[in-house]
Amino acid sequence: MLDIGIGFSSEENAVLAAEEAIWKAKDNLNNSSKIDLALVFNSSEFSAAGIARTFSALLSDVPLIGGSGPAVISEKGIYKHGIVLALLGFPEGAYCNTAATRDINEKNPFTCGKELAEKLLFGFKNIPRNLGLLFFDRLIDGGPNFIAGLQENLGKSFPCIGASLSGQNDLTRSFLYLNNEVFNNSCAGVIWGGKITFGMGIKHGWKPLGKPHLVSSTVGNIINSIDDKPAVELYEEYLAYDPVKLKKSLKKLSVSYPIGVFIPGEEEYLLRNVTSVEDRGALVCQGSIPEGSTIRLMISTKETCLAAIPQAIKEAQKTLDGSLLRQSNARNSKFAIVFSSISRYNLLRRDIKEELNFIKKSLGEIPFLGVYTHGELAPLMESSYRGQIYFHNQDFSVLIIEG
């Protein structure tokens, strides 16, 4: 069975925080001499180099993956200054492999995705592969093409989940960790296989408002027109703001009123934040929207936002209950990784502790760690996740791993 040790620290100094998190995680392991993977998240103001050096010194050759984000999630609380770490010992017959692709905004996205898949698959010949976990240090241009390249080698229906840890225009850039290295403008991933099973869930809690609209002209993540009118008129119509006030307030307003993209065959709308308005009335979004898409303005309350948490966790647990590993009656253990959009943090604000309470109540005794993100990566389909992988905004996603 999986040996799981999770540790947390909010020490001010990066080195001391990393040391404390490691010792606490080791204390929670049954066998601290056999560690097969380390997974780490820390808040972005820490020195990434200091953390990496500490991990290298104290964990030597243990494969390490993770990154820094705007806030971390632990069983102790939600912290804008902290580090949370999971140390994992695998059961016999379970495997993983880590890899990264770099300079992804300077290279062809499809090629980068394909390169990462090739690296991840190295050493996985004749081993059943089950799941990919991916981290981007920031939102990338050409995200759908990156996924297409990844799936070219992993398979069109291979399940992946992950996160972008900072936004495209963030001044406080995030960093990724892979083994003893620190880097950005990259994607790091881990592929799991063998006697490991998983369940994933993703929900957001936003509901459609008003009638459907047609995206009539786009270029990448920029919507030029909706219903053959300047795209900004969508918000002018529903929110009754004059153009000047709307332009100043839209980034904040779009947290409460994102754009929902209808995906044929899916129950959930795919959310897109609007980050700015161009002078000509085009909307700049946090993620691409294909031309010809049907969209609706979306609305949420704190209550529906929080209700998405147990829904996502229930979805993940439902798949675990039907897994072959579970049906074998083998003695297993499990842990959870949670990703929550920073937009949810900003919406909940003083009620952010409620998000943690919902997570703890819904997961029960399952240990967990997580991070706030600027974008999530997951399929939409509930049934075995055998569908297209999408970049999401404003979602809560959970991955439960059992072995």
How should each PLM-predicted stretch be described?
Residues 1-37, 41-58, 62-63, 67-71, ...:
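Small-residue-enriched flexible segments
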